[in-house]
Amino acid sequence: MKYLVLVLCLTSCACRDIGLWTFRYVYNESDNVVFSPYGLTSALSVLRIAAGGNTKREIDVPESVVEDSDAFLALRELFVDASVPLRPEFTAEFSSRFNTSVQRVTFNSENVKDVINSYVKDKTGGDVPRVLDASLDRDTKMLLLSSVRMKTSWRHVFDPSFTTDQPFYSGNVTYKVRMMNKIDTLKTETFTLRNVGYSVTELPYKRRQTAMLLVVPDDLGEIVRALDLSLVRFWIRNMRKDVCQVVMPKFSVESVLDLRDALQRLGVRDAFDPSRADFGQASPSNDLYVTKVLQTSKIEADERGTTASSDTAITLIPRNALTAIVANKPFMFLIYHKPTTTVLFMGTITKGEKVIYDTEGRDDVVSSV
């Protein structure tokens, strides 16, 4: 039995709720996490056109397309071993739907990893220099790559001169982080969920089709467990403009996530079963199944956003007139496409780099904020 490896690589943003539900299983209360619901569902949409029968029914992800731009680019590539016969109608649909062609490679060759890495590096203009570190299993016959990249700056940047070292409180540990600070007119609101209070604030990007939702709760885990698309849309509908002082850490997070277990718990099972997988829509041999679903995601947030910008808008008003949004404890962020409410990237920040106080005596951490 041959098998297919599904690899998702993202660097930095609805899909059916499967993307948000998956985050419930990859969330880690003791570490920072970044994940792309759109990256996962866009890859599954490719897999779905190759599937038939119950395998197709389980991969139930409707199309949710965010148009490419110089600020946002989604890349889907399919690498197929030269020995695997493909149905012409499948290759035609793949090329038509995703504006690229199936790439033929020899997976049992010694340089296949370098060939794929070089191809992706060229296609992304160097933004994704490497997608494969370890060698692939020599029995691999297909590899699906989904790459989602977003580069944009805040509509109103944070002034770097206001960035200072501040405490970040997480459980029994206090970290020292670089905390950004600005005053702006933003959409914000305070909500309550299962007796957990939390605020949601929208931080718009310069390109107005995307924005970040900053969610600062009293109990982050409770919000993660309740998260779905209807809740996100509820936030968006009910936020109101207010003059806010936003205090949040600069952060850089990279996550490598194995999504197989999460997808199986959400009902995508036949695709991973050698005896039940049906990918006969792609190949008449119909002897493929999925063994891996890996997603590598990265995001950076600083005073400018993710690219340089000269916009600065700081308004001085009486401090007692401000709504204070202070993310000095574990929080969630979601970057979404406003026309479609598609969640492109999301993540949680639960720790900083340097411990300055620990009631349990720990004195070291490895993640960076």
Swiss-Prot record:
Important in virulence. Keywords: Protease inhibitor, Serine protease inhibitor, Virulence. GO terms for biological process: negative regulation of plasminogen activation; negative regulation of vascular wound healing. One of its GO terms (cellular component) is extracellular space. This is Serine proteinase inhibitor 1. PROSITE patterns: SERPIN. The keyword Electron transport does not apply. The keyword ATP-binding does not apply. One of its GO terms (molecular function) is serine-type endopeptidase inhibitor activity. The record marks 319-320 as: Reactive bond. It comes from the Viruses. PANTHER family: PLASMINOGEN ACTIVATOR INHIBITOR 1, SERINE PROTEASE INHIBITOR, SERPIN. Belongs to the serpin family. Poxviruses subfamily. The gene is SPI-1. The lineage of its organism: Viruses, Varidnaviria, Bamfordvirae, Nucleocytoviricota, Pokkesviricetes.
